[in-house]
């Protein structure tokens, strides 16, 4: 009974894997009311979710997702964040994904419109003139021709649509913010995932390992779900089943620390303008933070031996105009 599960979570008890699986199955199959979903999400947020719970939830939702099959093998990278950090930065991970793709990394970016922010990845890509509602066949073709495709979450995860109303009504960070970055329909084997709350880093990293992701960096930078230039970034790197924890600083890359206001964003149109200014050669903090996050994606995509080498490559890609030309090419696919 769903009421028994709610009572267990409310009493701060962790769910066994089979209990978590049954709960998400009931939600995905539409057997749970919005009121019950709201209760579950609230209770899970208060208790905190474990790696095993996240893994079980993700398995259920991935089994129901529209899958993307490509005609190429090898490493695919996704760059995304949990959101909910309240930092109001521009769409850094989206810009970083474009730079990584221009560097030759195959990127399958999975995302949505903004929920807790003014501009989600889908919103800014739309403002850039890049198509966001690709069919699986169109997405596979885009990866083959341009190294990148955007997978609009509602088109690939119909089961998640069943919780949309309840999520809007409760209006706070929930387990679905955590699940989103784990549900890439292409099964991307490498992930750069930003986490807005450090409490979730260990459980997300553990879930990635349980889900078979071979290489990932789970990052939190000075209160944001990005690798930051405003302070230190905490990193959990998963590689070959082993998790290594370390910190990164802007100074390691020759970048001067700045205030968060210098990397603030706005509307989708404003964020698109920031990105195109960067790709057109404008220097400054916004460019620096995009290069730093792109460096991680390039490293994860096996186009660099380390993140420092990835930073050099990202800088060359932007300075040479390759990232700008990629946006122009993607616009022509509409």
From Swiss-Prot:
Binds 2 magnesium ions per monomer. The keyword Transport does not apply. Anthranilate 1 binds at residues 81, 112. Belongs to the anthranilate phosphoribosyltransferase family. It catalyses: N-(5-phospho-beta-D-ribosyl)anthranilate + diphosphate = 5-phospho-alpha-D-ribose 1-diphosphate + anthranilate. One of its GO terms (molecular function) is anthranilate phosphoribosyltransferase activity. 5-phospho-alpha-D-ribose 1-diphosphate binds at residues 81, 84-85, 89, 91-94, 109-117, 121. GO terms for cellular component: cytosol. Mg(2+) 1 binds at residues 93, 226. Homodimer. Mg(2+) 2 binds at residues 225-226. Anthranilate 2 binds at residue 167. InterPro entries: Anthranilate_Pribosyl_Tfrase, Glycosyl_Trfase_fam3, Glycosyl_Trfase_fam3_N_dom, Glycosyl_Trfase_fam3_N_dom_sf, Nuc_phospho_transferase. The keyword Glycosyltransferase applies. One of its GO terms (biological process) is L-tryptophan biosynthetic process. Catalyzes the transfer of the phosphoribosyl group of 5-phosphorylribose-1-pyrophosphate (PRPP) to anthranilate to yield N-(5'-phosphoribosyl)-anthranilate (PRA). Gene3D superfamilies: Nucleoside phosphorylase/phosphoribosyltransferase catalytic domain (3.40.1030.10), Transferase, Pyrimidine Nucleoside Phosphorylase, Chain C (1.20.970.10). Pathway: Amino-acid biosynthesis; L-tryptophan biosynthesis; L-tryptophan from chorismate: step 2/5. Its cofactor is Mg(2+). Its EC number is 2.4.2.18. This is Anthranilate phosphoribosyltransferase. It comes from Methanospirillum hungatei JF-1 (strain ATCC 27890 / DSM 864 / NBRC 100397 / JF-1).
